[in-house]
Protein backbone atom coordinates (compact mmCIF):
# COMPACT_ATOMS: atom_id res chain seq x y z
CA UNK A 1 0.00 0.00 0.00
CA UNK A 2 2.88 2.40 0.66
CA UNK A 3 3.95 2.31 -2.99
CA UNK A 4 0.36 3.13 -4.00
CA UNK A 5 0.36 6.05 -1.56
CA UNK A 6 3.59 7.34 -3.03
CA UNK A 7 1.92 7.12 -6.45
CA UNK A 8 -0.98 9.23 -5.20
CA UNK A 9 1.39 11.82 -3.74
CA UNK A 10 3.51 11.95 -6.90
CA UNK A 11 0.36 12.23 -9.05
CA UNK A 12 -0.73 15.23 -6.99
CA UNK A 13 2.69 16.87 -7.37
CA UNK A 14 2.73 16.32 -11.14
CA UNK A 15 -0.89 17.54 -11.41
CA UNK A 16 0.28 20.96 -10.26
CA UNK A 17 2.26 21.29 -13.53
CA UNK A 18 -0.54 20.16 -15.88
CA UNK A 19 -2.64 22.69 -17.84
CA UNK A 20 -5.97 23.69 -16.28
CA UNK A 21 -8.95 25.70 -17.45
CA UNK A 22 -11.67 27.55 -15.54
CA UNK A 23 -15.13 26.06 -15.82
CA UNK A 24 -18.60 26.68 -14.37
CA UNK A 25 -19.74 23.89 -12.08
CA UNK A 26 -23.33 23.46 -10.92
CA UNK A 27 -23.82 22.68 -7.24
CA UNK A 28 -27.12 22.07 -5.44
CA UNK A 29 -27.03 25.70 -4.27
CA UNK A 30 -25.72 27.51 -7.33
CA UNK A 31 -22.92 27.87 -9.83
CA UNK A 32 -19.24 28.06 -8.97
CA UNK A 33 -16.08 28.56 -11.01
CA UNK A 34 -13.53 25.76 -10.68
CA UNK A 35 -10.19 24.81 -12.19
CA UNK A 36 -10.28 21.50 -14.05
CA UNK A 37 -7.67 19.68 -16.10
CA UNK A 38 -7.77 20.61 -19.79
CA UNK A 39 -7.38 16.90 -20.53
CA UNK A 40 -6.50 14.00 -18.30
CA UNK A 41 -2.98 12.67 -18.85
CA UNK A 42 -2.41 9.21 -20.28
CA UNK A 43 -0.91 6.94 -17.63
CA UNK A 44 1.54 4.36 -18.94
CA UNK A 45 3.33 1.84 -16.77
CA UNK A 46 5.91 -0.87 -17.16
CA UNK A 47 4.40 -4.16 -16.01
CA UNK A 48 4.82 -5.90 -13.36
CA UNK A 49 6.98 -3.73 -11.12
CA UNK A 50 5.11 -0.55 -12.00
CA UNK A 51 1.59 -1.74 -11.18
CA UNK A 52 1.34 -0.67 -7.49
CA UNK A 53 2.86 2.77 -8.21
CA UNK A 54 0.59 3.06 -11.27
CA UNK A 55 -2.47 2.25 -9.12
CA UNK A 56 -1.70 5.29 -6.96
CA UNK A 57 -1.65 7.47 -10.08
CA UNK A 58 -4.88 5.89 -11.31
CA UNK A 59 -6.55 6.56 -7.95
CA UNK A 60 -5.70 10.25 -8.43
CA UNK A 61 -6.28 10.57 -12.20
CA UNK A 62 -9.34 8.31 -12.21
CA UNK A 63 -10.53 9.40 -15.67
CA UNK A 64 -7.21 8.89 -17.42
CA UNK A 65 -6.63 6.62 -20.37
CA UNK A 66 -4.06 3.94 -19.60
CA UNK A 67 -1.27 2.18 -21.45
CA UNK A 68 0.96 -0.76 -20.62
CA UNK A 69 4.49 -1.76 -21.55
CA UNK A 70 5.93 -5.23 -21.09
CA UNK A 71 9.67 -4.82 -20.65
CA UNK A 72 12.25 -6.68 -18.65
CA UNK A 73 15.94 -6.60 -18.05
CA UNK A 74 17.97 -9.48 -19.43
CA UNK A 75 20.44 -10.64 -16.82
CA UNK A 76 24.11 -11.35 -17.35
CA UNK A 77 26.98 -9.70 -19.11
CA UNK A 78 28.47 -6.27 -18.67
CA UNK A 79 25.74 -4.42 -20.57
CA UNK A 80 22.12 -3.88 -19.62
CA UNK A 81 19.85 -5.46 -22.24
CA UNK A 82 16.19 -4.43 -22.14
CA UNK A 83 13.68 -6.70 -23.82
CA UNK A 84 10.51 -4.88 -24.91
CA UNK A 85 7.80 -7.46 -25.50
CA UNK A 86 4.44 -5.71 -25.27
CA UNK A 87 3.00 -2.25 -25.90
CA UNK A 88 -0.67 -1.26 -25.61
CA UNK A 89 -1.64 2.40 -25.41
CA UNK A 90 -4.19 4.86 -26.74
CA UNK A 91 -3.02 7.55 -29.16
CA UNK A 92 -0.37 9.68 -27.47
CA UNK A 93 -0.20 12.46 -30.08
CA UNK A 94 -0.27 15.90 -28.46
CA UNK A 95 -1.24 14.44 -25.08
CA UNK A 96 0.35 14.76 -21.65
CA UNK A 97 1.91 11.38 -20.81
CA UNK A 98 3.02 10.12 -17.41
CA UNK A 99 5.38 7.14 -17.77
CA UNK A 100 5.38 5.28 -14.46
CA UNK A 101 8.13 2.86 -13.40
CA UNK A 102 9.38 2.58 -9.82
CA UNK A 103 13.08 2.21 -10.65
CA UNK A 104 15.06 4.57 -12.87
CA UNK A 105 18.43 2.78 -12.91
CA UNK A 106 20.42 3.07 -16.16
CA UNK A 107 17.57 4.90 -17.93
CA UNK A 108 17.78 2.51 -20.87
CA UNK A 109 14.36 0.90 -20.31
CA UNK A 110 12.74 4.34 -20.11
CA UNK A 111 14.39 5.50 -23.35
CA UNK A 112 13.62 2.22 -25.12
CA UNK A 113 9.99 2.38 -23.99
CA UNK A 114 9.65 6.02 -25.02
CA UNK A 115 11.16 5.35 -28.45
CA UNK A 116 8.65 2.51 -28.96
CA UNK A 117 5.81 4.83 -27.92
CA UNK A 118 6.96 7.62 -30.23
CA UNK A 119 6.51 5.38 -33.26
CA UNK A 120 2.79 5.99 -32.60
CA UNK A 121 2.90 9.77 -32.11
CA UNK A 122 4.58 12.50 -30.11
CA UNK A 123 3.15 13.74 -26.81
CA UNK A 124 2.99 17.40 -25.86
CA UNK A 125 4.92 16.58 -22.67
CA UNK A 126 6.32 13.44 -21.05
CA UNK A 127 6.48 13.16 -17.27
CA UNK A 128 8.76 10.35 -16.10
CA UNK A 129 7.79 9.17 -12.62
CA UNK A 130 9.96 6.88 -10.50
CA UNK A 131 10.28 5.98 -6.85
CA UNK A 132 14.06 5.67 -6.82
CA UNK A 133 16.55 6.97 -9.39
CA UNK A 134 20.28 6.79 -9.98
CA UNK A 135 22.19 9.83 -11.28
CA UNK A 136 23.47 7.77 -14.24
CA UNK A 137 19.91 7.04 -15.35
CA UNK A 138 18.84 10.67 -15.17
CA UNK A 139 21.91 11.67 -17.17
CA UNK A 140 21.21 8.98 -19.80
CA UNK A 141 17.62 10.17 -20.23
CA UNK A 142 18.65 13.83 -20.49
CA UNK A 143 21.20 12.92 -23.18
CA UNK A 144 18.90 10.60 -25.17
CA UNK A 145 15.39 12.10 -25.15
CA UNK A 146 14.60 14.99 -27.47
CA UNK A 147 10.91 15.40 -26.58
CA UNK A 148 9.75 17.86 -23.90
CA UNK A 149 10.02 15.94 -20.64
CA UNK A 150 10.55 16.20 -16.92
CA UNK A 151 11.78 13.61 -14.44
CA UNK A 152 10.05 13.14 -11.09
CA UNK A 153 11.44 10.85 -8.41
CA UNK A 154 10.85 10.27 -4.71
CA UNK A 155 14.52 9.51 -4.00
CA UNK A 156 17.81 10.09 -5.80
CA UNK A 157 20.22 7.38 -4.66
CA UNK A 158 24.02 7.33 -4.88
CA UNK A 159 24.91 5.34 -7.98
CA UNK A 160 24.61 2.16 -10.02
CA UNK A 161 26.75 -0.83 -9.11
CA UNK A 162 28.61 -3.03 -11.64
CA UNK A 163 25.42 -5.01 -12.32
CA UNK A 164 23.51 -1.75 -13.02
CA UNK A 165 21.44 -1.95 -9.83
CA UNK A 166 20.65 1.22 -7.87
CA UNK A 167 22.70 1.55 -4.66
CA UNK A 168 21.42 1.59 -1.99
CA UNK A 169 18.14 1.15 -3.92
CA UNK A 170 15.32 -1.03 -2.66
CA UNK A 171 15.88 -4.31 -4.50
CA UNK A 172 13.62 -5.67 -7.23
CA UNK A 173 10.38 -3.65 -6.99
CA UNK A 174 8.29 -6.34 -8.68
CA UNK A 175 9.63 -9.06 -6.40
CA UNK A 176 9.00 -6.90 -3.32
CA UNK A 177 5.36 -6.41 -4.29
CA UNK A 178 4.52 -9.81 -5.76
CA UNK A 179 7.23 -12.30 -4.80
CA UNK A 180 10.09 -13.69 -6.83
CA UNK A 181 9.70 -14.47 -10.52
CA UNK A 182 9.91 -18.07 -11.65
Regions found by a protein language model. Give the residues of each.
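PRPP-associated nucleotide enzymes
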Residues: 1-182
